[in-house]
Structure formats: C-alpha cells, structure tokens
Curated annotation (Swiss-Prot):
It comes from the Eukaryota. The chain crosses the membrane at residues 241-261, 270-290, 303-323, 417-437. Residues 10-22 have a biased composition (Low complexity). Disulfide bonds join C156-C170, C220-C221. Neuronal AChR that forms heteropentamers composed of two different type of subunits: alpha and non-alpha (beta). CHRNA5/alpha-5 subunit is only able to form functional nAChRs when co-assembled with another alpha subunit, can be combined to CHRNA4/alpha-4 or CHRNA3/alpha-3 and CHRNB4/beta-4 or CHRNB2/beta-2 to give rise to functional receptors. Interacts with LYPD6. It is found in: Synaptic cell membrane; Cell membrane. This is Neuronal acetylcholine receptor subunit alpha-5. The lineage of its organism: Eukaryota, Metazoa, Chordata, Craniata, Vertebrata. It comes from Gallus gallus. It is a multi-pass membrane protein. Keywords: Cell membrane, Disulfide bond, Glycoprotein, Ion channel, Ion transport, Ligand-gated ion channel, Membrane, Receptor, Signal, Synapse, Transmembrane, Transmembrane helix, Transport. Belongs to the ligand-gated ion channel (TC 1.A.9) family. Acetylcholine receptor (TC 1.A.9.1) subfamily. Alpha-5/CHRNA5 sub-subfamily. Residues 30-240, 438-454 are extracellular.
Length: 454
C-alpha cells in the first residue's frame, strides 16, 4: 500500500520558520543591555564625584525651560512656576564601546542611582530645593542629560507702585549647594529662557526672561551661580474694567453733587454713598497688594485722594445747605464784602446769570403829605392803614430778598466748587495715568522694537 504523503501544516515551512530566527535578536539586545548595566554599576558609588583626578572640575551645562507661570502672589510676594531644569555633564565612569554591547548608544538610568549635581534654587520659598527624581539619559561617551520638571515657589519682591499697570522683575538663582567652583562649575547654556512649550497665563505676561552667570566669593573659595530674571507684565484689562473705571466714575460722580439744587436732601446721601463705595474699593486693593509701608500704589493714592475729595464735598454741601436756609430772622445781616464777592464778582467769573440785588434798592421817596387841618378823620385813618400795609409789605419784601440772596450765594458756592472739583478730578486722573504711560513706554516699546529687529 503506497504511503500517503503527509499534508504539510500551514506555517510549517522554512519561510514560516524564518521569523523565529530573529526572535533571539531582541533577547540578545536585552541581554547586552543587562550586561552593560552590570558592567557600569558594578562597585559603583553614586556619592563619589565622577572625576579621574581629585582636582578635576565637572562642568555642568545649565539651562531653563518654563512651561507655565502658575501664579504671582502679590500678598505673600511669591512666584509659582513650572520649569524644566536642563542639565548636562560628562560622567567619566559611565562610558562604554557600543560595539561590545549590540550597538547600544544610550540608556535610561534613574537619577537617584547615579551621581547628580546638587544644583538648587537658592531663593526658594516652600522648602523644596531639589528637583524631581526622573530618569537621566546616559550616552556611551559619558554625556548625561537630565531634565527634571520642577514646581517652584520662589521669592519675588513685588513693586505695586503702578498697580494694576505694573511690571515685576522676579529672579530665580540656581547654584550648587555644597560644591565650590573648583569642583563643580556651571556653564550657562542659553541666554534666553526656553519658552517653546510655555502655556500662557491669564493675568501675567512674560516680557523678557534672560539668564546670567555670576560668582560669589566666600573666603578661599568661589561659588558659581546662574540667575534668571523674569520681567513680567500684568494684563490690566480685568482691573481696568472692574476697579479703575468705577473709581474714576465715582470721583466724577462727586462733582455732580454740586450740580444738584441746594435744597435737595439727596446731596448728602449721594456723597455718603460715594464715600462708602470708595471705602469698599480701598479694602479690595488692600486684600491684593502686600502690606508694606515702602511703596503705596498710585491707585491707592488716588482712592485716598478721592475719599478726601468726597469728605470735603460733604463738608461744603453741609455749609451750602446751611447758607441756603438762612434768613434775616436767623442770622445777622450779610456783610458788605460777602455781598460784593458772591453777588457781583463771582457770578460773572462763573458764567452765571446776574443777580439783581434789591435789598439796598432805593426806596421810593415818601410824598410830602402835608396835613391839612381841614382833613377828615376818616381820610387820616385810611392813610394810616395804607402806611401800615405799605410798611408790612416792604418788610416782607426785604425778608424775601434776603432769603433769595442767601440762596443765590449757596448756588454760587455750588457752581464754584463744581468747577474746582471737576478740575481737580481731571488733574488727579492725569497724574495717575501719565507715570504709567511713561513707564510702559520706557520698557515695553524698546522690548517690542528689539524683538521686531531680531
């Protein structure tokens, strides 16, 4: 009986077995990497500075990349940032020949397993001086690249003079905590802070961020450090809409108090309401800015000035209302100089309608009424009655004219302080904004021109 040919199973031929021949290659690479780690870290001491000679200096290329400006706490004078510390140095004890280890040119090693420079942020405010324990990239020639992400809270002296149109200069100072310059030297990699992955902040904008290297001498040793200066500008739109404009509006609202008639009781109510509103705004600013007696923000000075302004308007309004309700029965006769100034001179200067002074109007001359012995008694009685009525009417006219004169003086006072307070409000507002415009022109414009030229 002829042997029946066995059916060949799918995938059982040489072509199907070919991929299995390459299965050993990844295993070989893995074994080579394992062998490389054993070779590098056998008897390795991560606390020993990796140099061939004791006097050799390890040069650290240092750079900074910022990913986010998280917050600027003006009250506590802190700047919170998310940064990446770019560090690179040569480790003479971590070198190998790639040909001996399946062509491996780089490996990833945890940072807490090898020697790393103890570069910290000197002006740290939360006690966290070290970076995050992330892996380092070790190349075959001994070059180590380590870029740990760090969340820093650094101290920043806040200058609130031009709040909310202020620019702050916050610095971050990095250096070795234990090594001097002869052991570990820091080389500034980039003059500019890397902002390619920067996430914009809704309140602050980074104008410039530059680095510089310096040295601090302490006795026989010198200590290198790198300082990064961040010039940040506050975006003032929010505070302009909800703080500056209402404050200016309240100051000009005070001017309208003098436009109300003097007999209106709402004048005092309006002044008091404005004063309370300004007090609330002042408390809001006090919650934002740091408690310092060195610098007072311009907006704070403007609010205090406006509060004094409103207080004076209340005093003047009370005085004007008192004058408005004066009469000959409650006060003495008006002094001649008061009449001359407030009834004749000031109305012309204030473009007011001339007030006709009738108080000293020449009285009609009394007619000579020669008594006739032959006049009747009834005629004399009638004349006496007419004289009495005339005197009574003239007296009432005089009293009414005195009251009208005092009312007109109150109107003159209101008009005079209306123009005076309006002028002072405009000048105060200009004094607030002119220094801000000058400050921005001296800083923002050169930076913008420089960035355009580059």
């Amino acid at each position: 009986m002829p042997l029946r040919a066995r059916s060949r199973k799918p995938g059982a031929g040489p072509a199907a077995r070919a991929p299995q021949a390459g299965v050993s290659e990844p295993s070989f690479v893995a074994k080579s990497e394992d062998r490389l780690f054993k070779h590098l870290f056998e008897d390795y001491q991560r606390w020993v500075r990796p140099v061939e000679h004791l006097n050799d200096t390890i040069k650290i290329k240092f750079g900074l990349a910022i990913s986010q400006l998280v917050d600027v706490d003006e009250k506590n004078q802190l700047m919170t940032t998310n940064v990446w510390l770019k560090q690179e140095w040569i480790h003479v004890k971590l070198r190998w020949n790639p040909e001996d280890y399946a062509g491996i040119t780089s490996i990833r090693v945890p940072s807490d397993s090898i020697w790393i420079p103890d570069i910290v942020l000197y002006d740290n405010a939360d006690g966290r001086f070290e970076g995050t324990s992330t892996k380092t990239v070790v190349k075959y020639d001994g070059t180590i690249a380590w870029t740990p992400p760090v969340n820093y809270k650094s101290s920043c002296t806040i200058d609130v003079t031009f709040f909310p149109f202020d620019l702050q200069n916050c610095s971050m100072k990095f250096g070795s905590w234990t090594y001097d310059g002869s052991q570990v030297d820091i080389i500034l990699e980039d003059y500019e802070v890397d902002k390619r992955d920067f996430f914009d902040n809704g309140e602050w904008e980074i104008v410039t961020a530059t680095g510089s290297k310096g040295n601090r001498t302490d006795g026989c040793c010198w200590y290198p450090f790198v300082t990064y200066s961040f010039i940040i500008r506050r975006l003032p739109l929010f505070y302009t809409l909800f703080l500056i404009i209402p404050c200016i509006g309240l100051s000009f609202l005070t001017v309208l108090v003098f436009y109300l008639p003097s007999n209106e009781a709402e004048k005092i109510s309006l002044c008091t309401s404005v004063l309370v509103s300004l007090t609330v705004f002042l408390l809001v600013i006090e919650e934002i800015i740091p408690s310092s007696s060195k610098v007072i923000p311009l907006i704070g000075e403007y609010l205090v000035f406006t509060m004094i302004f409103v207080t004076l308007s209340i005093v003047i309004t009370v005085f004007a209302i008192n004058i408005h309700h004066r009469s000959s029965s409650t006060h003495n006769a008006m002094a001649p100089w008061v009449r001359k100034i407030f009834l004749h001179k000031l109305p012309k200067l204030l473009c007011m309608r001339s007030h006709v002074d009738r108080y000293f109007a020449q009285k009609e001359e009394k007619g000579n009424m020669s008594g006739s012995e032959s006049s009747r008694n009834t005629l004399e009685a009638a004349l006496d009655s007419i004289r009495y009525i005339t005197r009574h009417v003239m007296k009432e006219n005089e009293v009414r004219e005195v009251v009208e004169d005092w009312k007109f003086i109150a109107q003159v006072l209101d008009r005079m302080f209306l123009w005076a307070f309006l002028l002072v409000s405009i000048i105060g507002s200009l004094v607030l904004f002119i220094p801000v415009i000058h400050k921005w022109a001296s800083i923002i414009v050169p930076v913008h021109i420089g960035s355009t030229n580059t």
